[in-house]
Amino acid sequence: MAKGAESIYRYYEIKGEKVVRKKKFCPRCGEGVFLAEHKDRLSCGKCGYTEFKKK
């Protein structure tokens, strides 16, 4: 297994027989790059894409 591959399992959970993502993917970078969750925004560490959370 690649270095850090164990930590990717934190972003998924199993509900019944399905695997569900906990975080969103970056729309610019594509699948596999998750958006980091901050207090007021979601941001991509790779390309800098930011979505602000609605109040």
Curated annotation (Swiss-Prot):
<dbReference type="InterPro" id="IPR002906">
    <property type="entry name" value="Ribosomal_eS31"/>
</dbReference>
<protein>
    <recommendedName>
        <fullName>Small ribosomal subunit protein eS31</fullName>
    </recommendedName>
</protein>
<dbReference type="InterPro" id="IPR011332">
    <property type="entry name" value="Ribosomal_zn-bd"/>
</dbReference>
<feature type="binding site">
    <location>
        <position position="44"/>
    </location>
    <ligand>
        <name>Zn(2+)</name>
    </ligand>
</feature>
<feature type="binding site">
    <location>
        <position position="26"/>
    </location>
    <ligand>
        <name>Zn(2+)</name>
    </ligand>
</feature>
<keyword id="KW-0689">Ribosomal protein</keyword>
<dbReference type="GO" id="GO:0006412">
    <property type="term" value="P:translation"/>
</dbReference>
<dbReference type="GO" id="GO:1990904">
    <property type="term" value="C:ribonucleoprotein complex"/>
</dbReference>
<dbReference type="Pfam" id="PF01599">
    <property type="entry name" value="Ribosomal_S27"/>
</dbReference>
<keyword id="KW-0863">Zinc-finger</keyword>
<comment type="subunit">
    <text>Part of the 30S ribosomal subunit.</text>
</comment>
<comment type="similarity">
    <text>Belongs to the eukaryotic ribosomal protein eS31 family.</text>
</comment>
<dbReference type="InterPro" id="IPR022845">
    <property type="entry name" value="Ribosomal_eS31_arc"/>
</dbReference>
<feature type="binding site">
    <location>
        <position position="29"/>
    </location>
    <ligand>
        <name>Zn(2+)</name>
    </ligand>
</feature>
<feature type="binding site">
    <location>
        <position position="47"/>
    </location>
    <ligand>
        <name>Zn(2+)</name>
    </ligand>
</feature>
<keyword id="KW-0687">Ribonucleoprotein</keyword>
<keyword id="KW-0479">Metal-binding</keyword>
<keyword id="KW-0862">Zinc</keyword>
<dbReference type="GO" id="GO:0008270">
    <property type="term" value="F:zinc ion binding"/>
</dbReference>
<dbReference type="GO" id="GO:0003735">
    <property type="term" value="F:structural constituent of ribosome"/>
</dbReference>
<dbReference type="GO" id="GO:0005840">
    <property type="term" value="C:ribosome"/>
</dbReference>
